[in-house]
């Protein structure tokens, strides 16, 4: 009789444990589903915010371009445009480094070559940063 009692109690404990494991799995899967749904919502909101920012930046760029296109340029703006054209030429030469390096580096040693490219980077970055700063300053003045 004791053996039957032990087997019955063991069976009840095993079935209760199996039910608790099954309930845990269901609650975990429900939590996973809820987490996935919330992540999808967050990604959707983030995507909408990014697309709004892209649209705003495109609009600001168009406004800035139209401002410079439809009015007379000052001497300073003309100088900025010349620098921008020079930067674009330098960037084009960076797209084809073999040709540019062959033309510019004939007869130089490695240190002179490194100095040449460092100067070129400074020549490119300086006007670009200046243009970006001027554009942002103009936008801030318009907004303010």
From Swiss-Prot:
Post-translational modification Isoleucine amide, affected residues: 143
Key words of the record: Amidation, Amphibian defense peptide, Antibiotic, Antimicrobial, Cleavage on pair of basic residues, Cytolysis, Fungicide, Hemolysis, Secreted, Signal
Compartments (UniProt record): Secreted
Domain of life of the organism encoding this protein: Eukaryota
Species classification: Eukaryota, Metazoa, Chordata, Craniata, Vertebrata
Propeptide: 19-43, 74-123
GO cellular component: extracellular region
Membrane-spanning residues: none
This protein's record includes keyword Cytoplasm: no
Pfam families for the chain: Bombinin (PF05298)
Signal peptide: 1-18
Expressing tissues: Expressed by the skin glands.
Biological process terms in GO annotation: defense response to bacterium; defense response to fungus; killing of cells of another organism
Protein name: Maximins 3/H3 type 3
Protein task: Maximin-3 shows antibacterial activity against both Gram-positive and Gram-negative bacteria. It also shows antimicrobial activity against the fungus C.albicans, but not against A.flavus nor P.uticale. It has little hemolytic activity. It possess a significant cytotoxicity against tumor cell lines. It possess a significant anti-HIV activity. It shows high spermicidal activity. Maximin-H3 shows antibacterial activity against both Gram-positive and Gram-negative bacteria. It also shows antimicrobial activity against the fungus C.albicans. Shows strong hemolytic activity.
Family: Belongs to the bombinin family.
Organism: Bombina maxima
Keyword Secreted: yes
